[in-house]
Design a protein with these regions (language model features):
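Structure-specific DNA junction-binding interface
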Residues: 1-94
Length: 94
């Protein structure tokens, strides 16, 4: 088994930026509706927008990692449930 390739800072910044933009697009298009609902909920309880986007991006990254590892389609139901559970982060998938 090969060792994972280390991620450099530029790649990490690009991934973070891309995930954040994906979340912004979901909020703007209200698709899935859980994206806007999560933003509203966390804003009401005092979270800053940047922190909310980071939490939501973490959930998106978790699902994308699982999707790629398991060679399956994106699980929209899991994703929406995990968004609605924020600020509690989902458990890391094996």
């Amino acid at each position: 088994m090969s060792e994972p390739t280390p991620v450099n800072d530029d790649e990490e910044a690009f991934a973070e930026s891309t995930l954040t933009q994906a979340i912004e697009n979901q909020i703007e298009s209200n698709n899935p509706p859980a994206a806007q609902a999560t933003l509203n909920k966390l804003t009401l309880v005092g979270y800053e927008r940047g922190d909310i986007l980071n939490l939501m991006a973490h959930v998106l990254a978790t699902e994308i990692d699982a999707m790629l590892a398991e060679n399956r389609a994106f699980d929209t139901q899991w994703y929406e449930t995990a968004l609605r559970a924020l600020p509690e982060l989902p458990p890391e998938k094996p």
